[in-house]
């Protein structure tokens, strides 16, 4: 008898660091919602042409790619996936700044303010 595995959902190449996963999990726990996932999307905008959009989402879209990090689902839509392949999302908490940061090896340049990339 042959057992075939069901095809798994397609995963993306974005990495959520331990610090970012812990912060996202903390925010989700504060909201009391276990149905939300962290979504990263790339949209037109900013002076360099493209900008990131990072938000919690309760929707699953056709073609979404999903991976889980520390109990947090990270979703990338199929149109954004090529732009963020190999990117790393971190959470920084220092005197100078606090927030999520994205290190993307595909970005060839960014604007002076750092809000957008190309």
Curated annotation (Swiss-Prot):
Annotated GO biological process: iron-sulfur cluster assembly
GO cellular component: plasma membrane
Modified residues (N-acetylthreonine): 2
GO molecular function, one term: 4 iron, 4 sulfur cluster binding
One Pfam family matching this protein: Fe-S_biosyn
Protein family (similarity comment): Belongs to the HesB/IscA family.
NCBIfam families documented for this protein: iron-sulfur cluster assembly accessory protein
Listed name of the protein: Protein Rv2204c
Organism encoding this protein: Mycobacterium tuberculosis (strain ATCC 25618 / H37Rv)
Lineage: Bacteria, Bacillati, Actinomycetota, Actinomycetes, Mycobacteriales
């Amino acid at each position: 008898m042959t057992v075939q595995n069901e095809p798994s959902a397609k995963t993306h190449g974005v990495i959520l660091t331990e610090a970012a996963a812990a912060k996202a999990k903390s925010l989700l726990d504060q909201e009391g919602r276990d149905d939300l996932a962290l979504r990263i999307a790339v949209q037109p905008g900013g002076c360099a042409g493209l900008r990131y959009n990072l938000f919690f989402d309760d929707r699953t879209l056709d073609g979404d790619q999903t991976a889980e990090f520390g109990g947090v689902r990270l979703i990338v839509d199929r149109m954004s996936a090529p732009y963020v392949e190999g990117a790393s999302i971190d959470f920084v908490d220092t005197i100078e700044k606090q927030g999520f940061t994205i290190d993307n090896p595909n970005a060839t340049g960014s604007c002076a303010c750092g809000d957008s990339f190309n």
